[in-house]
């Protein structure tokens, strides 16, 4: 399992429905995180729990009054922030050979969707406000990164 996690002042995700209408399905504002999460075919059964802990507890925010370029002392949980979770199987793409990514290491959609749902519920159970994209949909994700401060988390 991999996640690209960015501190954001705002982030949103829109989905185009069957009629062609674009609708907003999730939106957060700072302090907040945008978490793009991909599940791997060989992920451990408890990888989602580790991911919940990492997203909730990683110290990605500066202490109150500290500049954004300074040391990071607080987690999204500690600052009372929000998380926008977007499923992103393309994070599992392999690009070592050729010009077309291979998705062979990505967890198939029917198995990956409940894993992403477990992460969302796990974060909410910790008292974190969570918004989501729409699993399997063609989404438009927008964000205003703070810093920018982005980390890759692998579980």
UniProtKB/Swiss-Prot annotation:
It catalyses: glycyl-tRNA(Ala) + H2O = tRNA(Ala) + glycine + H(+); a D-aminoacyl-tRNA + H2O = a tRNA + a D-alpha-amino acid + H(+). One of its GO terms (cellular component) is cytoplasm. GO terms for biological process: D-amino acid catabolic process. It comes from the Bacteria. Its main location: cytoplasm. The gene is dtd. A Gly-cisPro motif from one monomer fits into the active site of the other monomer to allow specific chiral rejection of L-amino acids. Gene3D superfamilies: D-tyrosyl-tRNA(Tyr) deacylase (3.50.80.10). The keyword RNA-binding applies. Disulfide bonds: none annotated. SUPFAM superfamilies: DTD-like. InterPro entries: Daa-tRNA_deacyls_DTD (IPR003732), DTD-like_sf (IPR023509). This is D-aminoacyl-tRNA deacylase. It is found in: Cytoplasm. The lineage of its organism: Bacteria, Bacillati, Actinomycetota, Actinomycetes, Mycobacteriales. It is an enzyme of class 3 (hydrolase). GO terms for molecular function: D-tyrosyl-tRNA(Tyr) deacylase activity; Gly-tRNA(Ala) deacylase activity; Ser(Gly)-tRNA(Ala) hydrolase activity; tRNA binding. A motif (Gly-cisPro motif, important for rejection of L-amino acids) lies at residues 147-148. An aminoacyl-tRNA editing enzyme that deacylates mischarged D-aminoacyl-tRNAs. Also deacylates mischarged glycyl-tRNA(Ala), protecting cells against glycine mischarging by AlaRS. Acts via tRNA-based rather than protein-based catalysis; rejects L-amino acids rather than detecting D-amino acids in the active site. By recycling D-aminoacyl-tRNA to D-amino acids and free tRNA molecules, this enzyme counteracts the toxicity associated with the formation of D-aminoacyl-tRNA entities in vivo and helps enforce protein L-homochirality. The keyword Glycoprotein does not apply. Keywords: Cytoplasm, Hydrolase, RNA-binding, tRNA-binding. Belongs to the DTD family. Its EC number is 3.1.1.96.
